[in-house]
């Protein structure tokens, strides 16, 4: 875990705070130096990935080949001896799930807006030969303009046999899985996605799942029966659409093609859902080419040719981010970075990668790596090395809508499935190579490293330390800190607590566990916590504008987003004390640092079942005090119920 791993990355990006983290990956907010645009950088450790390393190919290949207004955009891929960096579109609005929590449930008009965007994204990926196979609110991010972006393609499948190819792998989240998957039958990926979309639509409009139970086998029986409650507030049109998607027999389910112009989705709209991409990969913008050629002192012809190679190197990233600026109405201009010790880049020649990204041909059966399902180590979450973060939302707007027709999606039934537990060595028979004609090399194996012992954990659980309210620090310094364990989310107000009868929870287990012996389950990913924390500190020192010795003494000022609950309490210390008093009664352990409480729950056997953060904050445009809530690990619906219970007990 040498700093050398970050050398290439730091040529082009300034790293900010950690906004998501896990056992083998973390996500950092960053700024692209030449455009100034914000990006999210997913940092994966090869050693921690282990046998899942080849499965990174599934995620990266899919994102290289998918370019759509409702799919999260990949900008840049960097490989070093120990790390893989994926530079992605930054979506500050957080998970769609947070929006559901804030609203309790969505009105049909709100749900229709979001669901049209979901249908658009899914229809597009099906038309490209992919099935997502892990559709759920946690895998949909909201941008600054309330538009959705589909993420997490680690379980996607592109069958070698085409869209009619039947799949066998059982994967995804149990509560969203189609009956044919949990029965272990061969299935068509696109049909399974339609079922998941039905569950997702129900969750949007009801605020809870149609099929849910503590016991996974009971949950499976409910799914296979296909019977669910129909709340009185649902309109006849929405009830009909749900029944058409949640058909136990996949052949009776509505197709994506018919979804595009379904009467419920057309209500209030003059045209069917627009599924085609607004920015196909073949298109190169002339204004962006001109700016890049002038900036790097290269001919327009050479610049256009380099962009058209779509190598997902810094050239690709610079072009895509510059084009994003143009779509926002911003000036199409690049700025020359002058980082300490860096020489300005003067030509594209200097930007060409020293080596291309290498992939390893999958030889580990049907193992799948899910980027969005990060596991957290207790040492990392409850460590002494805790910092705060503050950032301003900023994300590209959606392109202007245009009319389009859908041609062949309903003939795109199948998509592959990849198991997390299978460890036998065999070819990946379901996924065809998404990057035809591109490098067929393999990921380089990680270089040997010498482990460094962890530092002692001196934090004590459940100890309240009232922050010093007399000291103040400038807001601009907060955004330069490099904190840990805070995924992207935003939110407004928590309202309309779910009724007591909604107490059953979704089971966040591998679907595979129903069909496989426990000896086949893979071991937990290793976490190099102390090494990562030390590296974060080194990066903080090396990155310009980082300030040593920064400490926050008062509550942060935040915008009233979807994951911030407003309260009627004006004193932040009083609110903090109320939360601390309530947590033990809910069997929640916590570690406090300033105004943030890092919380976790455990099973009777000591296994961590839930990890989340509660932070007392000041709302930036008022004198009101709020609570920022953030799920880090565990079932999303159990988290929703628990946080609502805590806030209700605090009487905020």
Curated annotation (Swiss-Prot):
Q: Which residues carry this modification: Phosphothreonine?
A: 169, 415, 450, 452, 482, 484
Q: Which reaction does it catalyse?
A: L-seryl-[protein] + ATP = O-phospho-L-seryl-[protein] + ADP + H(+); L-threonyl-[protein] + ATP = O-phospho-L-threonyl-[protein] + ADP + H(+)
Its EC top class is transferase
List GO molecular-function terms, semicolon-separated.
ATP binding; calcium ion binding; lipid binding; non-membrane spanning protein tyrosine kinase activity; protein serine kinase activity; protein serine/threonine kinase activity
Active site (UniProt): 134 (proton acceptor)
Pfam family of this protein, just one? KA1
Annotated KA1 domain ranges read 603-652
Post-translational modification comment from the UniProt entry: Autophosphorylated: autophosphorylation of the T-loop at Thr-169 and Ser-173 is required for activation. Phosphorylated by the maturation promoting factor (MPF), composed of cdk1 and a cyclin-B. Also phosphorylated by some MAPK. Phosphorylated during oocyte maturation. Dephosphorylation destabilizes the protein. Degraded when cells exit mitosis.
Task: Report which residue ranges the record marks as coiled coil.
Answer: none
What is the activity regulation comment for this entry?
Answer: Activated by autophosphorylation of the T-loop at Thr-169 and Ser-173: in contrast to other members of the SNF1 subfamily, phosphorylation at Thr-169 is not mediated by STK11/LKB1 but via autophosphorylation instead.
Where it mainly occurs, coarsely classed, is membrane
Keywords on record: Apoptosis, ATP-binding, Cell cycle, Cell membrane, Kinase, Lipid-binding, Membrane, Nucleotide-binding, Phosphoprotein, Serine/threonine-protein kinase, Transferase
Q: Which GO terms describe its biological process?
A: apoptotic process; cell population proliferation; erythrocyte development; hemopoiesis; neural precursor cell proliferation; positive regulation of apoptotic process; protein autophosphorylation; regulation of heart contraction
Please state which protein family the record places this protein in.
Belongs to the protein kinase superfamily. CAMK Ser/Thr protein kinase family. SNF1 subfamily.
Name of the protein: Maternal embryonic leucine zipper kinase
> What is the native source organism of this protein?
Xenopus tropicalis
Annotated gene: melk
């Amino acid at each position: 875990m040498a700093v050398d791993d970050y050398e290439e990355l730091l040529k082009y990006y300034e790293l900010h705070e950690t906004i998501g983290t896990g056992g083998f990956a973390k996500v950092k907010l960053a700024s692209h130096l030449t455009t100034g645009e914000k990006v999210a950088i997913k940092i994966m450790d090869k050693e921690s990935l282990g046998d899942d390393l080849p499965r990174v190919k599934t995620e990266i290949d899919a994102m290289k080949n998918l370019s759509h207004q409702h799919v999260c955009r990949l900008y840049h891929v960097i490989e070093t001896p120990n790390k893989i960096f994926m530079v992605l579109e930054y979506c500050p609005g957080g998970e769609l799930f947070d929006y559901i929590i804030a609203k309790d449930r969505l009105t049909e008009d709100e749900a229709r807006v979001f669901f049209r965007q979901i249908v658009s994204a899914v229809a597009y990926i099906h038309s490209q030969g992919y099935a997502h196979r892990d559709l759920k609110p946690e895998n949909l991010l909201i941008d600054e303009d309330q538009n959705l972006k589909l993420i997490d393609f680690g379980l996607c499948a592109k069958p070698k046999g085409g869209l009619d190819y039947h799949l066998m792998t059982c994967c995804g989240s149990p509560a969203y899985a189609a009956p044919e998957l949990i029965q272990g039958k061969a299935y068509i990926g696109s049909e399974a996605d339609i079922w998941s979309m039905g569950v997702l639509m129900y969750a949007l409009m009801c605020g809870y799942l149609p099929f849910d139970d503590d016991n996974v086998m009971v949950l499976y029986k409910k799914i296979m029966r296909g019977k669910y409650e129909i709340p009185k507030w649902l309109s006849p049109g929405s009830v009909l659409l749900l029944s058409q998607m949640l058909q136990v027999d996949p052949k009776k389910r509505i197709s994506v093609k018919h979804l595009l112009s379904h009467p419920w989705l057309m209500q209030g709209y003059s045209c069917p859902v627009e599924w085609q991409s607004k920015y196909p990969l073949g298109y190169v913008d002339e204004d962006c080419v001109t700016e890049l050629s002038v900036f790097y002192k290269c001919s327009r012809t050479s610049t256009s040719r380099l962009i058209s190679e779509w190598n997902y190197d810094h050239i690709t990233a610079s072009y895509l981010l510059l084009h994003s600026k143009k779509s926002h109405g911003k000036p199409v201009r690049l700025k020359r970075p002058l980082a300490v010790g860096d020489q300005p880049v003067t030509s594209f020649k200097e930007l060409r990668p020293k080596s291309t990204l290498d992939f390893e041909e999958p030889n580990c059966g049907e193992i799948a790596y899910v980027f969005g399902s990060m596991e957290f180590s207790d040492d990392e979450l409850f460590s002494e090395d805790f910092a705060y973060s503050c950032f301003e939302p900023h994300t590209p707007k959606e392109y202007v809508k245009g009319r389009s027709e859908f041609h062949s999606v309903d003939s795109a039934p199948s998509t592959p499935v990849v198991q997390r537990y299978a460890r036998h060595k065999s070819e990946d028979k379901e996924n065809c190579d998404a990057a035809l004609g591109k490098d067929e090399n393999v990921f380089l194996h990680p270089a040997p490293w010498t482990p460094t012992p962890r530092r002692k954990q001196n934090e004590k659980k459940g100890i309240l330390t009232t922050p010093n309210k007399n000291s103040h620090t400038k807001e601009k310094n907060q955004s330069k800190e490099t904190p840990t364990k805070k995924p992207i989310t935003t939110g407004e107000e928590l309202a309309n607590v779910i009724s007591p009868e909604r107490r059953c929870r979704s089971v966040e287990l591998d679907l595979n566990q129903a069909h496989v012996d426990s000896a086949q389950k893979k071991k937990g990913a290793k976490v190099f916590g102390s090494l990562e924390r030390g590296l974060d500190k080194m990066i903080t020192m090396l990155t310009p504008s980082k300030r040593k010795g920064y400490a926050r003494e008062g509550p942060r000022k935040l915008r009233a987003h979807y994951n911030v609950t407003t309260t009627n309490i004006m004193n932040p210390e009083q609110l903090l004390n109320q939360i601390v008093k309530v947590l033990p009664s809910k069997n929640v352990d916590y570690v406090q640092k300033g105004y943030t409480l890092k919380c976790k729950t455990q099973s009777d056997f000591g296994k961590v079942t839930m990890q989340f953060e509660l932070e007392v904050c000041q709302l930036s445009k008022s004198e009101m005090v709020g609570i920022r809530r953030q799920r880090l690990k565990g079932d999303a619906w159990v988290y929703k119920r628990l946080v609502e219970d805590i806030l209700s007990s605090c009487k905020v």
